[in-house]
Each structure stands twice: as C-alpha cells, then as structure tokens.
Amino acid sequence: MSVFFENEFKNESENEIKNESENRCIMLPEEVKGKGYFALTGSKLKAYVEKWLDGIDEERDFVEEILNYCKRSRKTVYRRAAYRNAVYGITGLPSTGKTTGLLQAIRKLAAYEKCVYISFDRKTDGDLDTLQQLLDRLNDDHKYVFIDEITCMKDFTNRIGILMDQYTSRGKRVVMSGTDSYAFWKVDRYWHIGCLRSISFMSYEEARRTTGMDFSSYLMSGGLYGTEKYKGTKGLWNYIKDSIVDNLAFSVRRNPIECSFADMSETELCQAVFLTMCIIVCSWEEDLQLDGLLDTIFTGERSTRRSKIIGNLGQELGITFKRVERQVIEDILRMLEDMKVVVVILNLHRDSYGAKYMITVPFLVNQIAWLIANHVVKTGEKWKEESVRQINEIALKSVVISHTAYHLWHKTCYYYRDDKTEVDLVLLDQEDLRLEELQASLVDINITNHADTAYEKGQRMKEVNPYFFEELVYGIDERIILYLGPTNKKKGLTNVMDFLESYQQRNIKTEKYLDEMEKMLMDEQKQ
C-alpha cells in the first residue's frame, strides 16, 4: 500500500473511530424528555435554572459542600481511599430544598456546558437502564452530573453503586438527591457513597441565617420547611404519611427489602408508625426504656394512666395494639433508625440493656408530645405548668442528640442511668471508658433557664477537635460526651476539657510506649 493510501486509510479510520464515539454518545442534546424524566444541559439548563431560582437568594449550607466536592481535583480525591469513585448524595423530606440546592450549585459553578441535570418524577418508577443510556451519551466535556430523585429507580439499592462507579472512575463528579432516605442509607451501608447528607432539618445556625428563626421557634419546628400545613392531629398524620410512610412504602416496593409490614395497607402502616412515635415520646416523658414500655403494653400490664392515654389516642386515630403486632413496631424502629429518623441510645451502666430511642425531628417530638399532653387532660388529669417545660426539654434533647448523631452517625450512642444517678447521657464510641472517668466528665445541659445557652454548649461540645479523642491502644477514633440533666458538677465545659486534656496526655504516653516497643522489635529482628 502506498504512503498516500496508507495515510488516507489512517485518516478514514480515525474519522470512523471519532464518528463511532460521537454516535455512542450521540452528543447529548441540550434537552431530552421521556416518561417520568427529563435531562438538560447547556443553554436549556441555564434557562431552567434562572427560571427556577428567580427570587430565591438564600442558600442551604450543603450548596457550598457540593461546590467543594465538584471543584476538588481528581488527584486530591484519589489521595484518600475513602473518596475513590465517591459521589455526593443528598436525602431529605419533600420540600426541604433538594432541587433548589442542586440548581444553586449548578448556577454557582457557572459552567452550563459542563453540567448535566437529570430529573426523575418520584412517583413514577424509574428504570436504571434508562439512566445508564443517558449517562452513556455524556461526552468528555460533561464533568458535573446532577441526578434529582434518583431513589425512584427500581432495584436502586442493588445496582446504583456499580453504575455510579463506571462514571466516577472517569473523573466525573456525580451529585445525587432522593426523597426516599431509607433506600439511600441502605445503599450507603454496603457501598460507601462518599458523602451522604440528610437535609431534612437544619442546624440552628443555618435556620437563623436563612429564615431569621429564633430559638423558641426552632425548638418547635427543628428548622423544617413548610411545617405550617402540618399543624394539629390531622396535619401530624399527613406529615408522618408524607415524610415516613411514603418513604418506607416506596423503598420496600422498589427494592428487594424484607419486612413484616410489606403487605400492610398505607393506612395500617401510618397507624403503626404513628403508634411507634407515640411510644417513643411516652418513654421519654415517663423516663422509661423502650423495651420495658413495650413489655407492659403488649402483656396488658399497663398502668391506668398509660392505658387511658393509649385508649384516647386509639379512639381518635383508630390505633389499637390488637391491629399492630410487636414485630411490626420493632421492624419500623429498625428502619426509622436506618433513615436517621430515630437514634437508639444504650444504657452504659446496664451493659447496654434497656435501650431508649430519640426522635431526631424536633417538629415531630413537639407535635406528638403536645398531642399526648392534650389526651392526658382528657383522662381527667389537670393541666400542669411543668408540662410545657417538659415538652421543651424533650425537644432540646432531640435537637442536641440528633445533631450529634447526624454528624457522627457511624458512632454508637449511650446513656447512663443507675438507681441513684438521674442522668441522660449521650456517649459515642465509648466501650472502654471507665465509669470514674465518665462521672468526672459530665457537662450540664439544662433548659430550665437558658435554652439557647444549653444548646450552644452541646454544639460546642460536638465540635471539639477529634484529635483529643484518639486512642491508639484500643483503636478508638472519637469520643463525644454530652450530659443532659441535673448534676452537682460545675456547669459548663470545664470538666470535659480537663478530661480530654488528661486523656491526650495518656495518648502521648501510649504513643511513646508503642514507639519504644516497635524499636525493640526491630532491634530483635536485626539480631
């Protein structure tokens, strides 16, 4: 073959490969619409973003986190194994700002030609094959992929990890959002997403910045959006249906998840979830661990007061224990824990026996506590002024515990309760802490006088540098100590900081000891 024809053949082959590549991608047009989804990029995406965000100025905190994730260099991402092939996941209840946050991040990136926004209808069962076909049409210039309501996909929990790996390994940044948080958390348990952020509630700082909300209002709402439409018993029922029941129902229907309530109707599931929430709040009001309360309820050994309260609730809501089996409640508790709607707290003093549960949504805690308080009045008891303080205390505990558990969700929570000491304590990753060390490090957080100060104490305690919690011998990463309740210890953080400083000194000694042991072993090997 002559050089001329050889070069001509080579050029044709290169063009063929180029055309084949373009056909494979089909140069994703600026707008694609299908049943239950649409995809936008370029000028079409810019127009959509500008229209959606017209008049919206305030940004949620997670928007800046998305930008940091998108702008992080591939080299930086790959430096840590935990972030290889990582995506950024957002989960949250309806109307909490997921879509708005995604579009705000796209606007701040100011690179519409490099961004692709794919939106699915949550109420339509999506097809991962359709999503893959869309993603296969991306070209090298499409660096940032935003997928809204991805949890509507059938078999999402089993397939999404492998699918996302295909694209993040090519250096693309993938940001996913989904309302069905149970499916999202289940995926993250087996396939580490990289960063999974729940935005259903806001921190007090964020709520104050974005809405001007004062602390009293924050304790009532927890920073949730649109709580006005969920007031009263009917509104509370609708909130539980919208935020929890639909979440569980969609996740179970679309994914191979085994549970005892798979065949229950929506109304029956609503009743079971509502009942579970009421039991949790009752356990905190009456200072009981949950299993013990369930035992007394299901064995029929109920106190007259509790029996009347439950009877009145059942009469109004159609809830009876004959229609809700204990196994259903236990399954719901497990799923609510996976969804981060509740957090389990074990009793350190009793070798983890006697678990308590805390609802992490202050709005739910408040509404259910007030509902129960009103039914107490219906049983003939007089209204007590301390009931308001008690409800606020439960809400404060919910705020402090849920925010701590959210930021350190991979840790284990404990409380401490013996026969003499009346405390509610939250400790994370705390198996080997001696009780004398524990008692020397209590921090008082009490709502009686200054709720905002108490809350800030809890927040500051949460933000202590994890370096102080390192333990080389036992492999413990972090220690967080929060104390809720009366104590004769000095109020404030003094005792905790003293404890942490002494603990740090032990760490230094331990590290020195390990260095000496390592040196001895090396010397022995040389000999």
Predicted regions and their residues:
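Structural recognition of the conserved hydrophobic beta-strand(s) that form the central parallel beta-sheet
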Residues: D148, G171-D180
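Short glycine-rich substrate-engagement loop in P-loop NTPases that contacts/grips substrate
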Residues: K114-D140
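Accessory nucleic acid-recognition modules appended to NTPase machines
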Residues: D246-V423, L427-D429
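Conserved P-loop NTPase "ATPase switch" module shared by AAA+ and STAND
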Residues: L138-F156
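A cross-kingdom feature that marks ATP-driven nucleic-acid transaction machinery
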Residues: S2-E8, K18-A47, K51, L346-L348, ...
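Interdomain motor-coupling "hinge/lid" segment immediately C-terminal to the ATP-binding subdomain
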Residues: G178-T179, F184-D295
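Walker A/P-loop nucleotide-binding motif
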Residues: Y83-L102
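P-loop NTPase Walker A phosphate-binding motif
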Residues: T99-E113
